[in-house]
A protein has these predicted regions:
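N-terminal non-catalytic accessory region
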Residues: 29-171, 175-263, 267-282, 388, ...
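Serine-hydrolase catalytic core
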Residues: 274-288, 296, 333-339, 345
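N-terminal secretory signal peptides that target proteins for export/translocation
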Residues: 1-11
Length: 464
């Protein structure tokens, strides 16, 4: 190589180095995708839209409002005077210290993740990068309705910024994961009418890049059935006193989202008094009547609802079950596919969670009893079933609320013949309780790593 050629090569190399430096500087200057934090069931404050009185979370029952929705045959039109305001950042009762819910996660994203919180209605000039938006929503309502609201808000921001190609990352806790999955698969479309099968369009791929599902019950939860039968429990404790927030089964009956958290079709594990498997179709109203589950048959029902609501109750109940079934079918309609969106599952399985039910006919009353917890009982023939025997069939690995089986959608994935029906890039397990996942520092740091492009692709990574 002569001197002139060497000079040319040096010149080309220098220009290439300058170009690469400029390109890397440009990429660094672009900032990170904005992220959306979606809470789970009961994770948003609910206020009266006229008086601004906070109804949830509020330990002492309001004198003017409760959480029950008006009963209508059309589940998608069930609204009242309550609207979602902020996410639940912490819960404080009386003189006791506040309990972190999502406030710690937001702070971690700001201090360790390099994000800043923005408002949907009035984003700053740079609200399209390194930003965090909280998606508070009325968690009582139909999940499809809330998924469509999410897409509408995202599209609205993109128009405000005049950035049609802008994409958001999502961190969705618990039921929020079902909302984000539907938004990703179907965009702002409703469930198909009648008996038409859902066909995922992955319309959400134009809006979303990464979705982190944090403790999401992808196959539902037996606890939701328990809530519909016995009332809503907070921390496995059922409280229903006159001066405390109503959590009775009559309140839960009016909440469409409660039905949509039932175990997905053909995933419920049920056993008889011999602890042998029995087939139960949760989405057949006749089954609810057979086992004494239908709250409409309760003697107190008429005293809890108006005459108009009593007339509509059966139509509403059947519609709520049907829509819940169709939502689960829609979420399972693209097994193993992700539509170009990266899904990450982050959860816990170091504890236990209710995984099934046992149905027993009472020898004295001839009525059915439904067991969710391992409590010993005596069969009609006098033989006993111990708590330890029940524990083996009723309880599975999980985070106290969601089983690992539901979190990973294992039953549906196995039936579909795919590794993950959710199409997840990876599964990560960190030892924590369901309601404390977002507040866990290890979970926060792991999610920050995912958002920064450092998420592992190794299946079944576990940290105890």
């Amino acid at each position: 190589m002569n001197k002139r050629q060497r000079k040319n090569y040096i010149g080309i190399g220098a220009r290439l180095a300058i170009l690469l430096f400029a390109l890397s500087s440009s990429l660094l200057a672009q900032g990170k995708n904005p992220i959306i934090l979606i809470p789970g069931l009961s994770g948003s404050e609910l206020r009266n839209k006229t008086t601004n009185e906070r109804i949830w979370f509020k330990a002492v029952k309001s004198k003017s409002e409760d959480l029950r929705l008006p009963i209508l045959a059309d589940v998608t039109k069930m609204h009242d005077d309550l609207i979602a305001s902020d996410i639940l950042r912490e819960v404080k009762i009386g003189i006791f210290p506040g309990i972190d819910v999502y406030g710690g996660f937001i702070k971690a994203m700001e201090t360790r993740g390099g994000y800043h919180e923005e408002k949907w209605e009035s984003p700053s000039e740079n609200g399209f990068e390194d930003s965090l938006y909280v998606f508070s929503y009325d968690w009582r309502l139909d999940n499809v309705e809330n998924a469509r609201l999410l897409v509408s808000r995202v599209e609205g921001l993109k128009r405000k910024f005049n950035k049609p190609d802008l994409k958001f990352d999502i961190v969705a806790h618990s039921m929020g994961g079902l909302i984000s999955r539907y938004a990703a698969m179907y965009g702002d479309a409703d469930l198909p009418a009648g008996n038409r099968k859902p066909q995922p369009t992955w319309a959400g791929a134009r809006d979303f890049d990464k979705i982190v599902l944090l403790g999401t019950p992808n196959e539902g939860s037996a606890l939701s059935l328990s809530s519909l039968l016995n009332g809503y429990a907070v921390g496995n404790l059922r409280i229903d006193l006159p001066f405390v927030q109503d959590s009775s089964k009559f309140m839960v009956f009016t909440i469409p989202a409660a039905y949509q958290l039932l175990p997905a079709p053909n995933t419920l594990r049920a056993y008889d008094d011999r602890l042998q498997p029995v087939s139960i179709d949760l989405y057949d109203p006749k089954v609810w009547t057979k086992y004494g589950w239908n709250v409409i048959d309760d003697k107190k029902f008429n005293s809890k609802f108006s005459s108009e609501e009593q007339k509509t109750a059966t139509a509403y109940f059947e519609a709520a079950l049907d829509r819940a079934k169709r939502l689960h079918e829609a979420l399972a309609a693209a097994p193993g596919k992700s539509g170009g969106i990266d899904f990450y599952l982050v959860g816990a399985d170091c504890g236990t969670a209710p995984d099934s039910v046992v149905v027993v006919r009472d020898g004295n009353s001839d009525k059915w009893k439904t067991l969710f917890s391992p409590k010993a009982f005596t069969r009609s023939d006098g033989s006993k079933v111990t708590a330890e025997e029940l524990k083996k069939v009723l309880i599975g690995p999980g985070d106290g609320i969601v089983t690992r089986r539901s979190f990973e959608a294992s039953t549906e994935s196995e039936k579909a013949g795919v590794r993950s029906i959710v199409g997840s890039t990876s599964d990560k397990f960190i030892c924590e309780e369901h309601n404390k996942l977002a507040a866990n520092a290890k979970v926060q740091d792991y999610i920050i790593g995912i958002l920064n492009g450092k998420g592992t692709s190794a299946k079944d990574s576990t940290e105890k």
